Amino acid sequence: MNGLMATEVVGTFPMSTLVCMVISGILLVAFPIVIGMYTKAKLEADVRDVAIGAVAYLLIGLIFVNVLSIAIQMIPGVQEAMKAHDALRIAAEMILNIVPEIGLLALFLRRRKEEKQNLGCYMEFMIGYTAVELVMVAATVMMSNAMIAFTYNGSGIEGVAEMAGISADGDFSYLNDMMAIPGFTYLLSGIEGCLLALVRIGFVVWMYMINKRGLSHRYYIVMAVMYALVKVPSALNTVGLLPTLAVDPIVALICIGCLAYEIVLMRRMIPDEVGPLFKKPEIEFHRKKKAKSQSKDQGFH
């Protein structure tokens, strides 16, 4: 009887939800490919840097974070303290969420003084890093959800159980949770993944400009804060302080804000080396207009 109650699932997945899942998965797979092709066409690219970026994500985003998490929990008394004090648990989750981004910044800081590094090197590294994250993590989860949803609509719980290789008497209540999520949220999750990737790529260009122009290191602090802000909603959701449905919209808004700030900064100080990638006619127009006004002033004096 308990098994039957555990497998009770009400309704089916709406077609709109299925479509949004598929579109989201396609977006997450296509994004790094499109960005990679665009960068290859605009800059001298090296496939080796793509591979380095991919390995960096595996080492930092997956292996190191998991090892760090296990190491923290193995410290005597830590698990008990985290169970007793929510603040400590929240702090640990926040740190684990932010560690990959700070590690990524550290890699760039380590290589920033190498003169051989050009914008293509930075971009290809980030494309490799982003591709692994989006394709192997985000897109895999989204397409897996889509397969489960299509299988359930076609063959019911028995089909899902057969696909997963488990008993049909198990607990499939998670299907109710998946159906309760509006289809647009799945689509927004894919869009948010692409926005986050754009933010990171913007950081790469930003980092290149900071290094090339020898600007103040306070920009690194701004970057670290923005990275942290992007990861805060997920960390709050992990510890139960933010509803799951609110995470993607909030992260998307934060990413849009970060992108807006990056674009403003880039438009103010685009160096000649970045011109082929981010050339804007209006910027050239303003430069010519400014040069004309300066020549007039010099002639007047």
Regions found by a protein language model. Name each.
Residues 2-301:
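Hydrophobic alpha-helical segments at protein termini of multi-pass membrane proteins
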